[in-house]
Amino acid sequence: MENNNPYNLSPNLLKRFEQFKKIDDKTKMFERVIALGKRLPVFDVSLKTEENQVKGCVSLTYIAAKLEDAKVYYTGESNSHLVQGLLALLIEGFSGLSPSEILLIDIKFIEDMGLSQTLTASRANGFVNTYNMMQNYAREMLLELSSDEALKS
């Protein structure tokens, strides 16, 4: 049986994955990514801290996470329209998942999606750093949930 979701993508991310795979024009792909970024809600200024800044990203990019009902919710912002769109892709794809579900998502999806071939090396590196930061938040929240469960026992 063929696995149509080898990267363990969330339903939202799988939907975007399928949409982007069909785009073979670099300009159209960038337009679609930028359009995604315009849909992100305004990022709370109080969250623009060094701790929430994505390191190794050419653009000034922030990502924050909160745990609510055992699910992780992300918010973010970048001063680059393209990076804002990439951020929106990840936020849309990761938010509302459990920390465990987030940790199962394989970053290699970006290659098969067709996006990695269109990004400059520095943008691709920034995307990886953003993904890693979101994974780290999920890891921290998984530990938090585990310790909460241990305290209840």
PLM regions and their residue ranges:
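N-terminal intrinsically disordered, cationic/polar leader segments
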Residues: E2, P6-K15, Q19-L60, L67-V72, ...
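Charge-rich (especially acidic), low-complexity segments
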Residues: L151-S153
